[in-house]
Structures are given as structure tokens and as C-alpha cells.
């Protein structure tokens, strides 16, 4: 029996998981997505082509790899089908869980209405409907992909759902969809997606028993986890390593090596606490150097320095075996590089993540910068100050930086 390798984000998402999944997918038979929706995105550069993936696992770019979308995902059929159109020959290479929940256009309408109602207290969601779709799942009124294979049953459920929820739609000022039109839309989705829908839990057990090499990929990052993140400024799913089990039907003994992904600095999209955010010129420089604009929304990302306190928290929560440090080259040319090494909280210095990050202040340690790391493919090729920075981060978080990325290109990756 094999064990599945796991990739998980350690910050607030957008860490660069796509490049590492693409890199590791070259040696794996299956790549499996366990949570999230199309609010998150991977950007992968191969040669002169750039791929933006939101729902399809990154293994799709390896013609030998097969791809699984697990039951922990909420899937927008419209957006998924659009994403499928980028690729040929997906049949036999793509498997969608019949237990994954369907995200429909009215979920996005509700999401956006809620954000408007909150005013300056808005969370800053992508407005894609992820929260309402997960809300329906937890409230036991959601619709699952397997129901697309049984149109009559799905139709009766949708009619009953709208009858029950009409007062909710009216109260929020959201126009309720026309039932017949929605059912016709779903029938179109069924024709495209039906060949890919199956019991992926049974598939996962089978490929583990067959000793296949399996890679599990999450979405977003630990600090956006519904339980362990900066609640309520979080996503609605489990983004940490434990979510791979519930989101794919695995047990903890099925999990092998855990690789955590982190940038050499920090970014965040949307509202919520961000202790090491730099609101000045250096934050702007990080954003420009790193092209920090959302894959899904195009929104500029908030930028700041590496937060070693939050990183230690994430490493422990996820049981990380090694860290992949991304975008080291974005720090090229800085005279000084800061790292948040502790927080000031209620008049005291602390080295852990408290209940609420809103009121903490960062305590920084400065490191000398370097001229160039871009394109380096060997650790010894890095400037001495860059190597010292990496070794210092390792000591702070208690885990080895086993992979270091020095550009968006697939080949510009250091393996230690």
C-alpha cells in the first residue's frame, strides 16, 4: 500500500502551490484536490504558456497523471467546464466525486448581497459563492454532483429548495432563479460532466491498495482555514492537512510526506488581520516585483514580510515535513529584509498566534539583502546573504526548506 504525499499552503493563500504541484506531479500517478472552490487559483508557467487553474488539479499538465476532484470541493459546473476547454483528452484522466457539492449562480448572488449588507465589516470574499455553497452543505440542503445523473430527483429537490428559501432571497434582495431555466442549464452541465462523475472514495482506496504514487493538493492557506485561520476573515472550508482525509475519504494513516508552501515574504487578499503587512513603499515594491494580483479577481494583494510566528503555527497544525520557499527572487535588490519574529500583544511579547490577531503588533528582525537569486538552481549558487536568510528561517520555524523557487519557470527550482 502506498501513502499519499500532501501539499498545503502555510500562509494566506497564493503561496505558489501550483508550481510545486506541477513540479511534483511529474513523478506521481494521481493528483487529487480535496477542498475549496473556484475562488482560489494556481498560476503555472511552462515555456511561453501560462495556465490559470481554479478547480482542475494541477496534474492536468502532466499527460501521464490522472486527476481527482474530491468530495470536499464545491464545484461550479459552468466555471469547471470553461476550465476544461483549455485541455484535450481528459476522459480517463479526470474523476469528479459524486459527493462534491454543486455551486450554482444564486450562491454567488447571495455571497455578493451579504458582502453589501455588511458594509465596512465585509470579509472581502471573492463573491464567487463559495461560502453560501458550503453553507447549504452544512445545512443539509445542498445539491451534489451525483444528482446530475438523476435529473428528476434533482429537479424535485431544487423546486423544494426554492419554495423553502423564497423569504431568504426576498429579504436579501436577491432575485430567485427561474426554475425551468436553471434545470435546463443543469441538463447541459450533465451532458458534459456525466462521464467524469464517479465514487472517488472507492477510487482513492483502490489506487492506494495498488501502490500508485498519489499527490494531494489543497487550496488557499492555513491562515484562511475555517477553524485555524483568522476567523471570521477566512474561507468556508478546511484548508489544513487534516482536510485531505475528510475531503477525499482517506484516513490519517494514508498520508505520507507533507510539504508546506510559503512565500519568502507574505501576501493576503481581502480584509482581515495581517500583522506583518507593509503599507509603505517596500510593500508596494513587493507587490510590483512579485506581480501580486489575484488569479481569480485581479485584485492587488496586500504585501508584507515573512511572519515566522504564523509560520510556526502553520507548520505544527499541518505536521509539515519540509517547506517549499517560493518567490525568493522577489526579494532581489532589497538592502534590508525584515522577518516578524514575535508579536506584541496586550503589553507583552509573545511567540504564538493568539485567539485574535487583530490587536497584535509585529516585532521584526532585519537581515541584509542581496543582489540576485533569480534563476538559481543550486543552493550553493545563491548569495551568502540569501543562504543565511534561508537558514535563519529554518531555525525559526523548526523545519527544513527542502525546495526553493527562484522564478516562475518550472526549471528554476532548488532541491535540497
Curated annotation (Swiss-Prot):
Please give the chief subcellular localization of this protein: cytoplasm
Q: Which residues bind Mg(2+)?
A: 14, 41
Q: Which residues bind IMP?
A: 14-17, 39-42, 126, 140, 220, 235, 299
The transmembrane residues are none
The EC number of this protein is: 6.3.4.4
Mind telling me which GO cellular component terms the entry cites?
Answer: cytoplasm
| MF GO annotations | adenylosuccinate synthase activity; GTP binding; magnesium ion binding
Instruction: Report the active site residues.
Output: 14 (proton acceptor), 42 (proton donor)
Task: Give the cofactor binding note.
Answer: Binds 1 Mg(2+) ion per subunit.
The cellular location(s) given in this protein's UniProt record come to:
Cytoplasm
Listed binding positions for substrate are 295-301
Going by the entry's taxonomy, the superkingdom of the source organism is recorded as Bacteria
- Which catalysed reactions does the entry list for this protein? IMP + L-aspartate + GTP = N(6)-(1,2-dicarboxyethyl)-AMP + GDP + phosphate + 2 H(+)
Cofactors (names): Mg(2+)
Keywords on record: Cytoplasm, GTP-binding, Ligase, Magnesium, Metal-binding, Nucleotide-binding, Purine biosynthesis
The cross-references to InterPro entries, in alphabetical order and at most eight, read: Adenylosuccin_syn_GTP-bd, Adenylosuccin_syn_Lys_AS, Adenylosuccinate_synth_dom1, Adenylosuccinate_synth_dom2, Adenylosuccinate_synth_dom3, Adenylosuccinate_synthetase, P-loop_NTPase
**SUPFAM superfamilies the record matches:** P-loop containing nucleoside triphosphate hydrolases
Per the record, the GO terms for biological process are: 'de novo' AMP biosynthetic process; IMP metabolic process
The pathway is: Purine metabolism; AMP biosynthesis via de novo pathway; AMP from IMP: step 1/2
**NCBIfam families assigned:** PRK01117.1, purA
Q: Family per UniProt? A: Belongs to the adenylosuccinate synthetase family.
According to the record's subunit comment, the protein's assembly and interactions are: Homodimer.
| Protein function | Plays an important role in the de novo pathway of purine nucleotide biosynthesis. Catalyzes the first committed step in the biosynthesis of AMP from IMP.
Q: What is this protein called?
A: Adenylosuccinate synthetase
UniProt organism field = Sulfurovum sp. (strain NBC37-1)
